[in-house]
Amino acid sequence: MKTGTLKLHPNSYHNTSYDFKSLAKNVPELEKHLIKNPAGIDTVDFSNSNVVYLLNKALLLHFYNLNFWDLPKNNLIPPIPGRADYIHYMADLLKADKIKTKPINILDIGTGASLIYPIIGSSVYDWNFVAVDIDSKSID
């Protein structure tokens, strides 16, 4: 992506600024939402939930090879970099505890409709997840 260091886990794909034009190639609907900030740098309106949804689709495709991701309207849209950060720190804890069991099996209670932790954990670390939620809209 672009230069500009963020303070995320060193293994994170999200330690640099987004290349929005490149991401918009993966999700063309995102392109019409690209704007310039006062410094003339491409960005998006992060307060617009539809734009964040489109950005997430682009990030999941670009970094995690996920070709399809959908979310019911009115559901929370997780910020992917922060969720990936959490997964990387979980991996550090497992490594520090010298967990040798393979494969790693994780129970995600309250996974939500996005399934974001299972998506990132299985993509980056090849972990297995059982994801549960009590909200029928999240499960459908």
Located regions from the model:
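N-terminal auxiliary segments of SAM/dcSAM-dependent transferases
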Residues: 1-76
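Residue-identity detector for glycine
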Residues: 4, 40, 82, 110-112, ...
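Catalytic cores of large soluble enzymes that bind and process phosphate-bearing ligands
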Residues: 47, 78, 82, 134
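SAM-dependent Rossmann-like transferase core, predominantly class I methyltransferases
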Residues: 54, 58-105, 117-118
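Conserved SAM/SAH cofactor-binding pocket of Class I
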Residues: 93-140
